[in-house]
Amino acid sequence: MRLIEQHWYRPRGWLTALLAPLEGLFALLAAARRQAFRRGWKTSGRLPVPVVVIGNINVGGVGKTPLTLALLRDFAARGVKVGVISRGYGGKAPAPTEVGPDSDPALVGDEPLLLAAAGAPVVVGRDRVAAGRHLLARHPDVELILSDDGLQHYRLARDLEIVVLDGSRGLGSGRLLPNGPLREPPSRLAAVDAVVVNGEGAQLPLPDGLPRFAMTLRPGACHALDDASRARDAAGFAGRKVAALAGIGHPERFFDTLAGQGIAVEQRLSFPDHHAFVPGDIPADADAVIVTSKDAVKLARVIHDAAQRARLWVLPVQATLAPDLCEWILARLKTKHGR
């Protein structure tokens, strides 16, 4: 973990003082931008179907993508046609682009590829309003749009805002960037519709009456990169030199999950979130290399050597929610729109 990230969760007095002016400037700019949309100085674009934003007020991996995948699964089970729009972080799409199974993660980003694999129409673009219109033009049967991230993208009008919080790390120092991990102050939570807490541990200063949902990430058995039906449990890795590789926002959670599964990992490799992997990133001396589903979609496109691919294993996770968030969303939208 970098020094600045350590400071976010274990503040150092001298660094707090040093970064205070930059934090103040960031706070001023963030507040001014939000007020510009709230007061009508800047206008938001509204789509013809309800929009639910799945976002966060802090940086780093909090579990938005597993949550979005869980909602896609639950909405599909209810017969609700849902589309997803995303910025496509890590991608370079210059205009709204629909994500397909053969899309290049360097163009559309890694998380959208994972979401598209779930069967939902996904469109990425810097302008989320344009992305939503592009999606609806191609998929006019979509009844609801989930915006994966985009809480601070106020140009997109939204019907519901759901914030995901990391239950173990909480809000860190509670300070704004670069002095803390927050994009917006904790008071922003008073304006959202609900929070989803991923895991447990931290005491979270949540506003009274704010609907709260608990999310648990449950790992499945590791499966081969090229064959999801070929699974291996902890015993299958016994006696082998195992490495774990992660290019996500909070890699420690992934490593801890492997340990909780009883998999002995000799080498842990952390890369920046949305890292563009190359074959040289795979440790040559490991018998097996376990990766996240998010990283697997990128590695599958850059690792072409058969022997190297055979050493790659994917740890899938599935989010479960309590109480039923999908049902709550539908009820809130019905109350708001009468449908």
Curated annotation (Swiss-Prot):
Q: Does the entry feature the keyword Lipid metabolism, yes or no? A: yes
What pathway or pathways are given for this protein in its record?
Answer: Glycolipid biosynthesis; lipid IV(A) biosynthesis; lipid IV(A) from (3R)-3-hydroxytetradecanoyl-[acyl-carrier-protein] and UDP-N-acetyl-alpha-D-glucosamine: step 6/6
SUPFAM superfamilies per the record? P-loop containing nucleoside triphosphate hydrolases
Kind of enzyme, top EC level? transferase
InterPro entries of this UniProt entry? LpxK (IPR003758), P-loop_NTPase (IPR027417)
Residues given in the record as ATP binding sites: N58, V59, G60, G61, V62, G63, K64, T65
Q: Which GO terms describe its cellular component?
A: plasma membrane
Quote the catalytic activity from the record. Answer: a lipid A disaccharide + ATP = a lipid IVA + ADP + H(+)
The enzyme's E.C. designation: 2.7.1.130
Q: Where are the transmembrane segments?
A: none
Q: Name one GO biological process term.
A: lipopolysaccharide core region biosynthetic process
Summarizing the function annotation, the protein's role is: Transfers the gamma-phosphate of ATP to the 4'-position of a tetraacyldisaccharide 1-phosphate intermediate (termed DS-1-P) to form tetraacyldisaccharide 1,4'-bis-phosphate (lipid IVA).
Q: Per its UniProt record, what NCBIfam families does this chain match?
A: lpxK
Family as reported in the entry's similarity comment: Belongs to the LpxK family.
- In its UniProt entry, what is this protein called? Tetraacyldisaccharide 4'-kinase
The organism's lineage is: Bacteria, Pseudomonadati, Pseudomonadota, Betaproteobacteria, Neisseriales
Gene this chain is encoded by: lpxK
